């Protein structure tokens, strides 16, 4: 039986050790935050968590290789799923609970003078903006931001249907990253989604939470039919390069020099 030798990555907190950590300097902590929920019929419940772990690790690797003093914290595997109470095992953390988790973790970082935190979000139901505003008042020395990989532009160059949830993009990622957990696409639903009858709610300037099972029959929004591992690999490398560069820049910029004159 052949054993697989694992190599410790010094920028992943769960893999490193006190001997290494106590003498190292860190400028940026990365907190991956996913969700546990159904992803159409063909993707695992932990899709967002796989993406959180893999994207954070690869981006941190890129930043670390350039000299960025970055550390990735263990991912939070549960997110806001208040619109899906009738989907079995769609686990929910209320925003207030998320705030308390962040407050406790930031208390540790602030005490230890790691004053830059990136919440790397992989779940559309999570929105940390208002929490960050409140936390900024509580921790004036901290720089806290959220990073949503799905907001990074460029996917339209590789995917026919960008979708929202368990569609071509996420399926391609999972086919590339962990194909053994992806069912054949012949078993996937089409990811058809109903829209609001009220036009403003579809135009983005008015908002209401969607009742998920009234919108989609298979829990997906976006057709995964054209997904391929090749597309997933290309776009994964694109977004992790962008996030890696972001983490590096954030690591090296002095805390009192975040702003500059607009050219």
Which ranges hold each PLM region?
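Extended, histidine- and acidic-residue-enriched regions that form the cofactor-binding/catalytic faces
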Residues: 2-117, 122-263
């Amino acid at each position: 039986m052949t054993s697989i030798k694992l190599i410790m990555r010094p920028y992943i907190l769960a893999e490193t050790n006190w001997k290494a950590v106590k003498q190292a300097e860190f400028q940026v902590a990365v907190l991956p935050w996913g969700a546990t929920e159904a992803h159409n019929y063909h993707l695992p419940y932990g899709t967002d968590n796989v993406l959180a772990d893999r994207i954070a690790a690869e981006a941190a690797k890129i930043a670390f290789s350039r000299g960025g003093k970055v550390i990735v914290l263990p991912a939070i595997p549960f997110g806001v799923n208040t619109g899906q109470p009738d989907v079995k095992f769609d686990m929910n953390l209320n925003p207030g609970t998320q705030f308390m988790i962040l407050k406790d973790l930031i208390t540790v970082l602030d005490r230890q003078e790691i004053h830059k935190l990136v919440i790397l979000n992989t779940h559309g139901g999570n929105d940390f903006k208002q929490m960050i505003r409140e936390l900024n008042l509580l921790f004036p020395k901290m720089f806290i931001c959220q990073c949503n990989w799905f907001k990074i532009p460029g996917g339209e160059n590789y995917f026919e249907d960008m979708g929202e949830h368990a569609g071509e993009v996420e399926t391609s990622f999972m086919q590339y990253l962990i194909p053994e957990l992806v069912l054949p696409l012949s078993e996937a639903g089409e990811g058809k989604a109903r829209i609001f009858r009220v036009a403003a709610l579809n135009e983005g300037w008015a908002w209401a939470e969607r009742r998920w099972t009234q919108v989609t029959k298979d829990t997906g929004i976006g057709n995964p039919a054209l997904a391929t591992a090749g597309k997933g690999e290309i776009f994964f490398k694109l977004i992790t390069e962008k996030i890696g560069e972001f983490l590096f820049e954030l690591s090296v910029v002095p805390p009192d020099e975040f702003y500059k004159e607009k050219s």
